[in-house]
Amino acid sequence: MTEKSISPSRDIGVVVPDNWTGYELDVFSLPNHYCEDLECVFIPHGVIVDRTERIAHDIMRDIGDNHITVLCVLKGGYRFCTDLVEHIKNLSRNSERFISMRVDFIRLKCYRNDQCMDEMQIIGGEDLAKLSGKNVLIVEDIINTGRTMTALLNQLEKYKPKMVKVASLLVKRSASSNQYRPDYTGFEIPNKFVVGYALDYNEYFRDLHHICIINEKGKNKYKV
């Protein structure tokens, strides 16, 4: 990824252009059983790690000196959340602005195959009452249309948290977007179905270190 192909922005993260074709599979280490199911490596693991560290810096700048309840959206958000929390801890450990964190979990079901369903299922919503009066940082893997996150935020508002911030590794450019933007964005990407780094296609591909584009053969192979 060069400066000309991908541009950084504090407001919308690193913008991956529509014409970005990614990297050839054979220049990276990938599980053999997935190689025929992938189109390209879209965002390499090292780039994800560096961008996550920068987001941690921004969070420290904005909400340091607070106790934060980190609400990790499972399953796709767990790896981004783990890495982000670790970066924040490392920064906090060597800073005058200390952030103490407690991590909680929620699951949102909104996909079948590669299609976003109309109804969002919240699993673990009965625990949301614990967030009353708390500073909450929601950590998500990807914002697609924005409707899922908007629905979750509306649900959280019923419990009157003190503050809510959202960090999403990816935000997808989509014609059906409601224009919702998280407070912290890793990468803004084209409207492509991505897998890897804990993002899945029917529970497959979570174990990939890189973010990749799944091909049609892969979609058909793992379709339910």
Curated annotation (Swiss-Prot):
Mg(2+) binds at residues 140-141, 200. InterPro entries: HGPRT (IPR050408), Hxn_phspho_trans (IPR005904), PRibTrfase_dom (IPR000836), PRTase-like (IPR029057). Transmembrane segments: none annotated. Gene3D superfamilies: 3.40.50.2020. GMP binds at residues 140-148, 172, 193-194, 200. GO terms for cellular component: cytosol. GO terms for molecular function: hypoxanthine phosphoribosyltransferase activity; metal ion binding; nucleotide binding. Keywords: Magnesium, Metal-binding, Nucleotide-binding. One of its GO terms (biological process) is purine ribonucleoside salvage. The keyword Magnesium applies. Belongs to the purine/pyrimidine phosphoribosyltransferase family. This is Phosphoribosyltransferase domain-containing protein 1. It comes from Xenopus laevis. The gene is prtfdc1.
